[in-house]
Design a protein with these regions (language model features):
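Compositional signal for N-terminal targeting/processing segments
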Residues: 1-212
Length: 212
């Protein structure tokens, strides 16, 4: 299991290195088919609409937080981890499976039009509440010291149960020699042991060592 910070552009090169080093013959990803199809159908139009609103906010003098901007566009664009995994699997001729739930993707993505309304972007992009540095610090506190600084929600539990079962079925069907599952770093927590039957080794892509 490779834990990433969603929307962190600096993580792309690190994820590429981890994939090449691990050399999996099957990759699974915390990404849904609904999310893929939504971006194919509406991503371009949403990015244009958001870009126009952002240009207006900048013209009004709003200081845009770059981390918040990255997080916004990571929701509209194809996730960096999807691009990295797709390119790796194409090069190696191996399977990539999207294993997240469509239900929660549809609920969250169907709010996108409201999210990119100008006044909502004013609040969202003027805040530094979710910086990459803070995400990395939170991850290391948990992975290295066991200090939990984030909630593990019921939604996460349902999604992890779905994803772990899906991965288990895929492993039985395809019998790969090595599987890599790419997910947000919070899913490495797994307080209910939903991935235990898969005997995962866990790593945060910003670290060099495995965090078992």
């Amino acid at each position: 299991m490779l834990g990433v910070i969603h929307g962190d552009r600096d993580g792309r090169a690190l994820l590429d290195k981890w994939l090449e080093s691990a050399g999996p013959d099957m990759v699974t990803l915390e990404f849904s088919h609904y999310g893929l199809n939504f971006r194919l159908a509406r991503g371009g139009a949403l990015r244009q609409k958001a870009g126009e609103a952002i240009d207006e906010l900048r013209a009004e003098g709003l200081r845009i937080e770059e981390d918040a901007l990255d997080a916004l566009f990571s929701t509209i664009d194809f996730p960096l981890e999807f691009t990295a995994a797709s390119e790796y699997c194409d090069r190696r001729g191996v399977h990539l499976f999207l294993v997240d739930m469509d239900l929660f993707s549809s609920v969250n993505l169907n709010r996108m039009d409201g999210l990119i309304a100008k006044e909502n972007l004013r609040m969202l992009l003027g805040s530094d509440q979710c910086t990459r540095g803070r995400q990395k610090a939170m991850a290391r506190l948990f992975l290295e010291k066991g200090i939990k600084t984030f909630p593990y929600t019921e939604e996460m539990r349902l999604r992890d149960r779905h994803m772990s079962e899906r991965i288990g079925h895929l492993v039985k069907r395809h019998a790969p020699s090595r599987v890599v599952h790419i997910c947000g770093w919070q899913h490495l927590c797994d307080p209910f042991g939903l991935y235990t039957a898969l005997y995962p080794k866990k790593a945060f892509i910003y670290d060099k060592a495995l965090c078992v």
